[in-house]
Amino acid sequence: MASKGEEKPELVGSKQGIVSVTKAKHDQIVLVLRVVAFLATASATIVMGLNQETKTLLVGTIGTTPIRATLKAKFQHTPAFVFFVVANGLASVYNLVMLGVDVFGRKLDCKGLRLVIISILDMVIVAVVAAGASSAAFMAELGKNGNSHAKWNKICDKFESFCHQGGGALIPSFIALLLLFLISAISIITLHNQKLTSPHATTP
C-alpha cells in the first residue's frame, strides 16, 4: 500500500513535466504564427490602404467631339474595403500586443485568467478578420463581374490596377485568417490542458 502511495506523486510529477514541455512547444509555435500573422495583416492593411487609381474615361460625345471625365477609384469609396482596412489594422495591432505579452508578460497572470482572456480575444480577432476579408472578397467579385440582375456594371475592365491591387490585399488577409484560426485553436488546447493539470483537477 505504501509503494502505491509513493508512485502516485511520481506519476503526477511526470505528467506535469510532459505537459510543461508540450506547453513550451505550443508557445514557440504560437509565437512564430503570430509573427507571420502580423506580417500578413499588416501587408493587407498597407496594400489596400494605398489602393487608388485615376483614369480619364470617355463618357460621351457631342457631335464628333468626345467628352472625357477624370475619375478616381479609391478604397474609401467602398465601405467594405474601409472595414477591411480597419479589421486587418486592428488584427495587426492585436498581434503586435500579443507578441509583447508572449515575450515579456508571461508572469502577468491574474488568478489564472491570462489564457482565458487570450483565448477569447483570439476568437474575436478571427471573427473580425473573417468578416473584413469576406466582405472585401464579395465586393471584389462584384467589381470584377458585376451583377446583371441588379444592373450593376463591372469596373475592373476600366480600373485594372485598382482591382489587381485589391485582390493582392485579399491574399495575405486570408492567409492571416488561417493562421489566426490555428492560433485560436492552440490557445484553446493549451487552456484545456492547463485545466487538466491544475491542482483542482488531480484526484487525491
UniProtKB/Swiss-Prot annotation:
Q: Which domain of life is it from?
A: Eukaryota
The family database entries (InterPro entries) matched by this protein are listed as:
CASP/CASPL, CASP_dom, CASPL
Membrane protein topology class: Multi-pass membrane protein
Query: Which key words are in the record?
Result: Cell membrane, Membrane, Transmembrane, Transmembrane helix
Membrane-side (Cytoplasmic) residue stretches: 1-28, 102-114, 190-204
Q: Where are the transmembrane segments?
A: 29-49, 81-101, 115-135, 169-189
Q: Which residues lie on this side of the membrane: Extracellular?
A: 50-80, 136-168
Q: Where in the cell is it found?
A: Cell membrane
Question: Does Transmembrane helix count among this protein's keywords?
Answer: yes
A matching Pfam family: CASP_dom
Q: Does the keyword Oxidoreductase apply?
A: no
Q: How does it assemble?
A: Homodimer and heterodimers.
* The family this protein is said to belong to: Belongs to the Casparian strip membrane proteins (CASP) family.
Mind telling me what this protein is named? CASP-like protein 1B2
According to its UniProt entry, this protein's organism is Vitis vinifera (Grape)
